[in-house]
Amino acid sequence: PKEPINGLLSKRYARARIKEINYEMNDINVKPGNPYKFQVGVKNPFLDYLKDWGEEKKRHNPNDGNQDFSSLEKEFNVGTTTIQAADKDGWVVSITPSGGWIPTVIAGKTGVGLSQRAQSFVLYDDENPYNVIEPGKRPRATLTPALALKDGRPFISFAVQGGDTQDQNLLQFFLNMVEFNMNVQEASEAANINSYQMYSSFGTHSKEAGRIVVRKDLPKWVIKDLKSKGYNVVPRDLT
């Protein structure tokens, strides 16, 4: 299906979604929005899927050969990096190479790894109708190399690794700079919060509604408040 790009980018749609945010408690039943309402002449063909969204179906076969992959999971997590570069002529690039380098197939002696991003596809329409595996199609990716412009000129080139946390960490980094007047170093070192509320892009595409990872040196009152709002808070050394 064709994505409702105009609806997704609509300011009216953004304002409608903001009104649905519960500022007092974690909403484990949060669902995707309906951008089709904000795109003229197009109806949403997936309303039935929205009604049942969040009801995970046990379709994974524990006997799948995929289970042998578990011994390599730690190495798999080192599969993404990022590069930001600019030259004297004003050209700026933001690149985030990825593809699950380990484990993967290397093309002969070239050192070129063949991407295994096809794991990010889903098999069933009700999981994500836009991301069902098909010939000639690329999967939904987590990669988000970014370039922010100010007055039509490059202002910040930025990106990060981290799977489904990439969009979250990049937004927090950007807001730290433009809203809270941090410099690049301060924004990079500031503590982030990562949510696992939505379906994962990897593995069995499961979700952990309410689970958030925070940096363990956050003020205790912040962690206490998050727990009081129904979150499962997981402190870590870095976020």
Please identify what each model-predicted range represents.
Residues P1-S98, A107-T110, D237:
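Internal maturation/activation junctions in enzymes
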Residues P1, Q67-L238:
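Proteins synthesized as precursors that undergo proteolytic processing into mature forms
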